C-alpha cells in the first residue's frame, strides 16, 4: 500500500478494533465518547458525535505493502499477513503480547520463485493455516500460491540469502518458506481471491480475463467463466452462492449454481470502482465506492417470488449515502452493528457512519399497521380511546357489514339498515326509501300496462313536476275537534305517490294514519308521531300520543306541557295562546315539538318554520310540503332542498333525486365525504336497469367494492355480490373467460354438450349434469373423437365420477340420482395451463392435497406451485 490510499480492516473477533494500513499499520480501538463536547485524550480521534477511536499500536516494519489480511481465528488475535510489491508475504503483528505459537509465526516470510507484485491475500476461514496469495503474471510461474503458515524453514538455492528479509529480533528464529502448498493459475495474473465458505477446498480467483473456481482436491481441473469483472471478488456472507466482482464502472453479481453468466449487472458511474463489500449484518445489501468520490452507493437486492422457470433479474433498490465531505479512500462495514461502517479519507481522516434503514410500512386491509426497521418488526396497537376511532373507520364498518350480508336483502329491503348496525339515521332513511320505491314500483306495474313504475325510481322531484296542472286544493277542518278554522290541503295522484314514498300513506286510497303512527310509538318516537298526527289535522290524536309518551318510564315531562298547550289551541291571531306558544317554542330542544307550534302559529301557506327546520327528517318535510304547498311553491322548495342534499351528500336526499343522474351526483358527494363505496354500490343497483348504471362513477364504486372484498379475502362475499349484481343488472353478467374446444376439430364442446344453447358459455357446462336423464358426452359431438382421460382415474372426461378414484360404483349412482341443472364441481374439467395435464376437479384436488408435482408419469411440472393464490384461504369466518 506504499504510495497508495489507506484501507480499513475490522478485527475478526474484536468488534471494537480495526486496522488502517497504507505505508504502515495502525491499530485503533473504537469506543463511545463520554459526551459530544468533551475533550479528546492524546492519541484519540473523534469519529462521530457518539464514538472516538484511540490509537493502540503502529507497525512500520513492513514497507512496500500492497495488501493486508487478518488472521481469521481468535488466537493469535493480532496476526496479520502483508503482501509486498516483490510478491513476498510477511506475517507480522501489532505490538501485542504473544504466546510461543505466535512468536514462531511473526516474521515468517513466504517467497515466490519470481518476484512480482502481490495483489491480494485470503485466509482460509476453516483451515486457518492456509493462506492464498494472488500475484501478477509471470510466464514461467504460477500466479495463485497457497501457503501453509505452519511449514518449517526450508532454504533453497533459488532464494539467495542476501535477499531474505529478516524481521526485527533474533535472526535465528526467523524463517523463509519458498515451497507453496499449492500452485494454481499458470501464465495469468490474479487480481482477487476469496475462499468459498461452503467448502474449504474451493477457491474463487479473479484472473486477468476470467473468474475461476479451483478445487484443491483436483488442481488439474477448474471451473471458469470468461469475464472482465475479475476484481474485488467477495462472497455474500448470508448467501454463500452469491458472489460480487467488478471491472471499471460495472459490478457483476454471480450465482455459483449457474456460473455461465452474471445474474445481474450493475452499471456504476463513469469513474472506475475501487471497492465493493457485502454488508455482514443485512442480507443482500452491497456497498460500492468509486475513485475520487465522497459517495457510497448501496444496492438492496429484494427477494421477491418469481414463477418457476422465469429468468428474471432480482429487484434492486438503489440509494446513495455521503458519510463525509472529503473524498473517500476506503470503507469497512462493522461486523456486528446494524448498517454501520467506518470510512477513511486519503489523509487518514476517519468517520463512523450509520446508514439509516429504509422503513417498510405495511397497512393490511384489516387496518393492522406494521413496519420494519433494522432487525425489528413493530406493530401499532390501539389502546384506550384509540380503539373507538378504529371502530369508526369506514373500512372497519364496511368489513363488518359485509360479514352480516349487508345490502343483499332484496325482499325486505328496509332490513338492510339493521344489518348495518341500525345506528345511522341516513342509512335508515335510504333503505326505507329504496324499500318504498321497490314496493310501489311493483304495485304500479301490476296495475298499469305502461312503464310508470320507473317514475317511482326517478324520485319525488320528478314525480311532483309531473303533477303540475293536475293538483286540486281542498279545505279541511280539524278531525275530532270543535275548531272551526279550515286548513287548505293540496292533492293529486302524484302527490299521493310522494306521500307513500315518504311513508305517510299506505297502499290504496285509504288515508288512515293509524298503523304508521302506531309503528312510531313502538319505536319511541313520540314527538315525531304527534307532529305527523297534527299535520294530518288530528289534534286529539297528537295530544293522546304526547300524554302516552310522558307516562312511559323514560318519558319527557315536556310532552305533558306541550299536550296542555295544544289543548288550548285557538285560531285567533292576537290571542295570548299564540304569544305564549311562540315563547315556549324557543325553549324546546326537540325539533318536532318546535315545528308543531310553528305550524299552529303560521299563516296559511307560510310554513317556513316547518319546511326549513333542518333537524327534522327530510321525508317528513317533503311530505308536509306535498300537503300544504301549491304547485309553484312545492316546485321551488323541492329544487332548493334537492340542491342542498346533493351538496351535503345527504342520503336522505335520494327520496328527492331517486336513482337518476342527480342521485349519482348526491352519492358522489356522499362517497367523497365518507368513502362508503359499499352503500353506494348497493344503492345504485337497487333501481331498475337504466343508463345510470353505465355511469363511470357507478362502475368505479362497484369495482372498488369488489376489490375491497378481494383484499379482505371475502371471495364468497364477492361472489354473492356478483350474483346479486347480475340479478339486478343482467347486462353486468360477464362473458365466459374459458371454454373447452376439441383438439382435433377445434369446435367448442361446451356448446354441444349444453341442453340450453345460450347457456353454453358457463364454466359449469364443462362437466356432466347430475340428472340421470341427460346423455353422457365422452366424445366430441363434432368429430366423435374421444375426450381426454382423467390423469388419475383414466376415465374419459364427460363421465360422472365420485369424489375419489377409489370410490365404489354405488357412490356414483347416488351422485347421479341428484337432480341438478349444473354439474357438480367434482366432475368439472380442470387442467394445468403449463403442462396441459388434468382431469376431474375432485380428483385433482385430492391429489394435490398430498403432492406438488403433476400426477402424470415423467412430468415434473409443479402444477400447484404455479398458482400463487392456491394456498390462500377465505377469511369470511375470521373476525377482525
Swiss-Prot record:
Protein name: GATOR2 complex protein MIOS-B
One Pfam match: MIOS_WD40
Gene assigned in the entry: mios-b
Binding site for Zn(2+) 1: 742, 745, 780, 783
Residues that bind Zn(2+) 3: 832, 835, 863
Binding positions (Zn(2+) 2): 793, 840, 843
Modulation of this protein's activity: The GATOR2 complex is negatively regulated by the upstream amino acid sensors CASTOR1 and SESN2, which sequester the GATOR2 complex in absence of amino acids. In the presence of abundant amino acids, GATOR2 is released from CASTOR1 and SESN2 and activated.
GO biological process: cellular response to amino acid starvation; cellular response to nutrient levels; positive regulation of TORC1 signaling
Keywords noted in UniProt: Lysosome, Membrane, Metal-binding, Repeat, WD repeat, Zinc, Zinc-finger
Start-end of each WD repeat: 60-102, 113-157, 185-224, 226-264, 268-309, 399-441
Zinc finger (RING-type) in chain: 787-868
Cited CDD domains: mRING-H2-C3H3C2_Mio (cd16691)
Protein's UniProt keywords contain Transferase: no
Record family assignment: Belongs to the WD repeat mio family.
Assembly with partners or alone: Component of the GATOR2 subcomplex, composed of MIOS, SEC13, SEH1L, WDR24 and WDR59. The GATOR2 complex interacts with CASTOR1 and CASTOR2; the interaction is negatively regulated by arginine. The GATOR2 complex interacts with SESN1, SESN2 and SESN3; the interaction is negatively regulated by amino acids. Interacts with SAR1; the interaction is direct, disrupted by leucine and mediates the interaction of SAR1 with the GATOR2 complex to negatively regulate the TORC1 signaling upon leucine deprivation.
GO CC term (a single one): lysosomal membrane
Protein purpose: As a component of the GATOR2 complex, functions as an activator of the amino acid-sensing branch of the mTORC1 signaling pathway. The GATOR2 complex indirectly activates mTORC1 through the inhibition of the GATOR1 subcomplex. GATOR2 probably acts as an E3 ubiquitin-protein ligase toward GATOR1. In the presence of abundant amino acids, the GATOR2 complex mediates ubiquitination of the NPRL2 core component of the GATOR1 complex, leading to GATOR1 inactivation. In the absence of amino acids, GATOR2 is inhibited, activating the GATOR1 complex.
PANTHER family: GATOR COMPLEX PROTEIN MIOS, WD40 DOMAIN-CONTAINING PROTEIN MIO FAMILY MEMBER
GO molecular function: zinc ion binding
ZnF start-end (C4-type): 740-786
Keyword Lipid biosynthesis: no
Residues that, per the record, bind Zn(2+) 4: 835, 837, 854, 859
